[in-house]
Amino acid sequence: MTLSSKLLLLLTLLLSMIPAASFAGSVTKDGYYNGIKLCGKVKVVKSFADIKVQVVKSFPDLKVKKVNAFPDQIGEWQFVDSFPDFTIQFVDSFPDIKIQYVNSFPGVSN
């Protein structure tokens, strides 16, 4: 294998990893993760969740406000035991998204 073919192979491998790294774990600007709108009724489960969530104090992907009714805006979550819009699992490492609880101005972080 020549040096130029090795470089071409290395470059191809590096470029193929860029799209996967840039989209992994990202919340879109309009508040979706993997097609799930990040507002609504949420159920916490111990396994097989739609989204793995880590609670952080700084640099969140999403700012979440707990509400008791009408979780209509992105970042407004109503925690329920039945009929959820999506499920989450709290994790300490390797989350799909990171959230921070807030009392006002929920939504996607800039």
Residues covered by each model-derived region:
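Repetitive, compositionally biased segments used for assembly/scaffolding
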Residues: 25-110
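Bacterial N-terminal signal peptides
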Residues: 9-20
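Bacterial N-terminal signal peptides that target proteins for export
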Residues: 1-9
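Generic extreme N-terminus detector
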Residues: 5, 21-22
